[in-house]
Amino acid sequence: MKILVDENMPYAEELFRRLGDVQAVPGRPIPRDALVDADALMVRSVTKVNEALLHGTSIGFVGTATAGTDHVDDTWLRQQGIGFSAAPGCNAIAVVEYVFSALMMMAERDGFQLRDKTVGIIGVGNVGSRLNARLQALGVRTLLCDPPRADRGDNEAFWPLEKLVREADVLTFHTPLNKTGAYQSLHMADDELLAALPDGRILINACRGAVVDNAALLRALEKGKKLSVVLDVWEPEPDLSLPLLARVDIGTPHIAGYTLEGKARGTTQVFEAFSQHLGQPQSVELASLLPVPEFSHLRLNGELDEGKLKRLMHLVYDVRRDDAPLRHVAGLPGEFDRLRKHYQERREWSSLCVQCDDATSAGLLQQLGFTTQLL
């Protein structure tokens, strides 16, 4: 059995070798000659999986080591009898920590306390629900918008988008990209929404680029709309708008979910799904794959305040480290993908054990996702 894996999927060769012969290939583009006689294909979001890619091949299973699936024509796969699996929630923690890093950077720059802000979360799935829980643990007021869940009668107080836009200080988008239908999210943030958004607000998009109409956002900013903007995803990618990049506060190359833990979860989830598909179910302990972080322990004396928390968060990951490289090379052919391919290793907060002498602080840090030890 021949299994193709994206060369940037960590641990993929090590794991999938248990099931067959493995060939690592670039994800954009995948060489046609490698596909012809392959039995399975494991991709990331950079690979468009559809009839044009797979027609005439022997591929019988596709796995994407990503939470989102808008790059995969799963309807066509189903019609062809091709097995398919994604990795829902694999990078949710990473995206949450990216959003926190961006908010803490802005709090430091603009002199506010995050606890004093109201955060509107649009899309309350794997990412949005975790973000909501961590913000609430910190004492931040949150407003939730999720029309599909609201229509199902889920036990949450959901807000209509048009009302949330007027009430929230921060809008952060965590929806799938639905181009049609009752829950269309394509260009959810359009000219009308941006016009309704009061000046001084923060807008964050770390889900899919086209959820925010990039042309409309650029028009609004060029006309003097006073917004702080964080974009990790763009419309289109990899050929993002340079004028828009110049006007956003934080711009990064679609790496919000790029922690080592998040990538490894994606790989292990599709590996386990494929092994199940073959009738050879195997499970993987994530911790057995991950290296010991270079910086793993820190002692915190006294009570935890927001300043100390910001320093802890940014010790593990500071979003500014990914903003500057994109601005330096944006517009150069292939550089967007190169930044992603050669992304500097990034860990999640759980990789840092904070030794505390205050039980309340230890409890809060644990709720936020840090590993803690009470002294």
UniProtKB/Swiss-Prot annotation:
Oxidoreductase as UniProt keyword: yes
Protein's UniProt keywords contain Cell division: no
EC number from the UniProt entry: 1.1.1.290
Residues where NAD(+) binds: 146, 175, 232, 257
InterPro entries named among the record's database cross-references: D-isomer_2_OHA_DH_cat_dom (IPR006139), D-isomer_DH_CS (IPR029753), D-isomer_DH_CS1 (IPR029752), D-isomer_DH_NAD-bd (IPR006140), Erythronate-4-P_DHase (IPR020921), Erythronate-4-P_DHase_dimer (IPR024531), NAD(P)-bd_dom_sf (IPR036291), PdxB_dimer_sf (IPR038251)
Keywords: Cytoplasm, NAD, Oxidoreductase, Pyridoxine biosynthesis
GO cellular component, one term: cytosol
Binding-site residues, substrate: 45, 66, 258
Catalytic reactions of this protein: 4-phospho-D-erythronate + NAD(+) = (R)-3-hydroxy-2-oxo-4-phosphooxybutanoate + NADH + H(+)
Location(s) in or outside the cell: Cytoplasm
Gene3D superfamilies per UniProt: 3.30.1370.170, NAD(P)-binding Rossmann-like Domain
Pathway(s) this gene product operates in, as recorded in its UniProt entry: Cofactor biosynthesis; pyridoxine 5'-phosphate biosynthesis; pyridoxine 5'-phosphate from D-erythrose 4-phosphate: step 2/5
Gene Ontology BP term (one): pyridoxine biosynthetic process
A single GO molecular function term of this UniProt record: 4-phosphoerythronate dehydrogenase activity
Pfam families found in the cross-reference section: 2-Hacid_dh, 2-Hacid_dh_C, DUF3410
Active site: 208, 237, 254 (proton donor)
Chief place of localization: cytoplasm
Function comment: Catalyzes the oxidation of erythronate-4-phosphate to 3-hydroxy-2-oxo-4-phosphonooxybutanoate.
NCBIfam families: PRK00257.1
Family: Belongs to the D-isomer specific 2-hydroxyacid dehydrogenase family. PdxB subfamily.
Record text on subunit structure and interactions: Homodimer.
Protein name: Erythronate-4-phosphate dehydrogenase
Species name: Yersinia pestis
Phylogenetic classification of the source organism: Bacteria, Pseudomonadati, Pseudomonadota, Gammaproteobacteria, Enterobacterales
